[in-house]
Amino acid sequence: MKTTDILILIGLSLGLASCGGGDEGGGGSASGPGGTPGGVPLESELPPELIEGTPKPMKEPNLVPAPKAAPEFLVPEGTELLSKGKTVTSSDDFPIIGDLSLVTDGDKEAGEGYYVELIDQLQWIQIDLGASSEVHAVWIWHFHSQKRAYRDVVVQISDDPEFKEGVTTVFNNDYDDTAKMGKGGDRPYVETRFGKIVDGKGAKGQYVRLYSNGNTSNDMNHYIEVEVYGKAG
């Protein structure tokens, strides 16, 4: 076979491989939506687009690109929103901006007055569902008026309010174990108005705790809204 023929074949092979695409965080993939096979689509009212300021470079390794559409995720039939209006506590007793009640008030808009800001370093918020429940999804909006990625995002579920026993970790993108809860295998992601859906995997617990450790724009921690979906116990 001539050298030119070999080069043509190599070029075709590379072209076909690139057509396979990659995970752009757009919700769903070649294998279909995530979540429970045979389940029903999880739906929530999405906030309008609002981009302010100049984003800073995001240098997080293995970063998932910003999605171009709402995520596709399936949950068991009968799954309900469990977190609306529920009590939220935090490792930061006095948030810099906003009130912890904003996390479960149902409003996902960006901008001043819609988010709570916690101090720097590793911090957590915790939602009390009121009873031990089967959790199938945790939908998170940290801050979406600027493209950024939050560091050391860990999501845990437990019946223990102190999170010392019976803890199930359903998401962890702390790749270097900064938070001292084990190295996570999940990838950091870019914040958008579509939020981030974490698979609850049917974990049971009354409390849902979310950690973060600053972001690519500044050292603070933010939450606009967190929605916990599942079946009450």
Where on the chain are the PLM-derived regions?
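A short beta-strand element within beta-rich, extracytoplasmic domains
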Residues: 88, 134-145, 210
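C-terminal motif of bacterial Sec signal peptides marking the signal peptidase cleavage site
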Residues: 17-18
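Trp- and acidic/polar-enriched beta-sheet ligand-binding modules for extracellular glycan
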Residues: 32-53, 117-123, 145-233
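Sec-dependent signal peptide recognition
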Residues: 2-9
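A short glycine/threonine-centered beta-strand motif
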Residues: 129-131, 158
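Predominantly extracellular/luminal regions of secreted and cell-surface proteins
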Residues: 71-107
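Ser/Thr/Gly/Pro-rich low-complexity, disordered linker/stalk segments of secreted
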Residues: 21-31
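N-terminal pre-domain segments of enzymes
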Residues: 30-79
